[in-house]
Amino acid sequence: WDESRPGFLEADTVAHCGPTLVGEFARTLTMTDMVTGWTENCSVRNNAAKWILAGVEALTGRFPFPMVVFDSDCGGEFINHDVAGWLQDRDISQARSRPYQKNDQAHVESKNNHVVRKHAFYWRYDTDGELKLLNELWELVSLRLNFFTPTKKPVGYTTTRDGRKKRIYDAP
C-alpha cells in the first residue's frame, strides 16, 4: 500500500447513546483519508452490518478519489463477512488496527471529538427524525470541513532556546 497517495481511508464509529448503552441508538460512521484529511460522516441506525455497509457505500461516493484501502479498528461492525465481501467485490484492500493499540487510527480517532462530538454533542439520538437530522448536519459539516478548513500535519519537533520541545507543522 502506498500510504502517501489519497485513498487510504480510516473508519470508526461513534455511539450517540447519551449516558446509557441500553436500547437502540444511532451511531455516526466517520471515514478519514490519511493523506488529505478529507473526512466524511454519516449516521446509521446501529452497528448492524447492513447499516454499516450502507454507510460505507454512501461515504465512499462522497470522496473525490477512489478508496484503495479500508482501515478500521477490530470492532465486529467492520470485521465481518459482509464488509469483507463488499470490499473484495470492489477490489479494495482491508486493513485493521492492532488489538488494544489506541494510536493505530490516529487520523480518524481525532475526528471523533473534533468533528462528531463538537457538532452532535454527547446526546442520545434514537428516533428516525433525529437520524435524518444528523445526516443533514453531516452534509453541511462536510462542506465547511473539507472545503473551507485548512489542515496542517505535524512533521517533526524542534527544541526551543529554553529546552522545550515544539511541534513543527507542514504548510496548510
Briefly describe each language-model feature range.
Residues K118-L134, K153-Y157:
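Short, solvent-exposed helix-loop connector elements
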Residues W1-T30, W38:
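Mobile-element integrase/transposase regions
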Residues L140-A171:
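Charged, gly/pro-enriched flexible loop segments at helix/strand junctions
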Residues D12, M31, G37, V56, ...:
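Mobile genetic element proteins and their domesticated derivatives, centered on retroelements
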Residues L9, W51-A54, F78-D82, K111, ...:
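Generic recognition of stable, solvent-exposed alpha-helical segments in well-folded globular domains
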Residues T32, A58-P64, D82-R96:
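Short, surface-exposed basic-aromatic patches at helix termini and helix-loop junctions that form
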Residues E24, T32, N41-P64:
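Active-site beta-loop-alpha junctions of metal-dependent nucleic acid enzymes
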Residues S72-C74, F78-L87, Q94-A120, N135, ...:
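RNase H-like two-metal-ion nuclease catalytic core shared by retroviral integrases
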